[in-house]
Design a protein with these regions (language model features):
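A short, structured loop/turn motif at beta-sheet edges
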Residues: 21-22, 51-53, 77-84, 106-115
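Beta-strand/loop substructures that line and gate deep hydrophobic ligand-binding cavities in soluble
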Residues: 88-140
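Intrinsic-disorder/low-complexity, polar/charged segments enriched in Ser/Thr/Lys/Arg/Asp/Glu/Gln
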Residues: 8-14, 21, 45, 57, ...
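Hydrophobic/aromatic beta-strand elements that line small-molecule binding cavities or substrate pockets
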Residues: 15, 47-50, 72-78, 101-108
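Helix-adjacent hinge/juxtasegments
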Residues: 59-81, 87
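Short beta-edge strand/loop motif at the mouth of beta-sheet-based domains
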Residues: 12, 32-69
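Hydrophobic pocket/interface hotspot
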Residues: 24, 34, 58, 76, ...
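Hydrophobic ligand-binding cavity/cleft-lining segments
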Residues: 1-44
Length: 151
């Protein structure tokens, strides 16, 4: 039997965007809008299904352009338009488990703009990822949302 390990982490990120909550929500809910930011840095999406609804399941294969080795399997648990998105996802790399996460996105009006709060509770499996790497990736994606909104 191979030794296994688990490290738990909680990531909390906040962003303020000039766009209103409806537009920020649409960045998650609309496939063309999400395609502009849905992977960190210069990574690419090689394959993706899109089913953004409560109970909807999405599969995405992504990673560096020359090696999109990661697969995220996402289940949407709760969606309140322009206010809240709650989902769980597992991530694998070349078929090996990397992590399992529960993520909450809270949107609230902030003047004419939006405050976005992301909280991700994650179990990192067998040392294949860590909180610092995940936080960097999530922060990059949130920054790309702002760029896509012109905010």
């Amino acid at each position: 039997m191979t030794a296994c390990s688990v490290q738990h982490g909680t990531i909390r990120l906040e962003r303020r965007y000039k766009a209103g909550p409806q537009r920020v929500f649409a960045a998650w809910a609309e496939p063309k809008a999400r395609a502009q930011w849905d992977v960190p840095g210069r990574w690419v999406i090689a394959e993706q299904s899109f089913d953004f609804r409560e109970g909807g399941r999405e599969l995405k294969r992504f990673g560096p352009r020359d090696d999109p080795r990661f697969v995220a399997d996402t289940l949407y648990l709760d969606i309140v338009p322009a206010q809240r998105i709650v989902f769980s996802y597992s991530m694998t790399s070349r078929g090996e488990p990397v992590s399992v996460s529960l993520t909450t996105i809270a949107l609230s009006a902030d003047g004419k703009g939006t405050r976005l709060l992301l909280v991700e509770q994650v179990a990192f499996l067998d040392g294949r990822d860590n909180a610092a790497n995940r936080e960097e990736g999530l922060a990059s994606m949130l920054d790309k949302i702002g760029e896509s909104l012109g905010a």
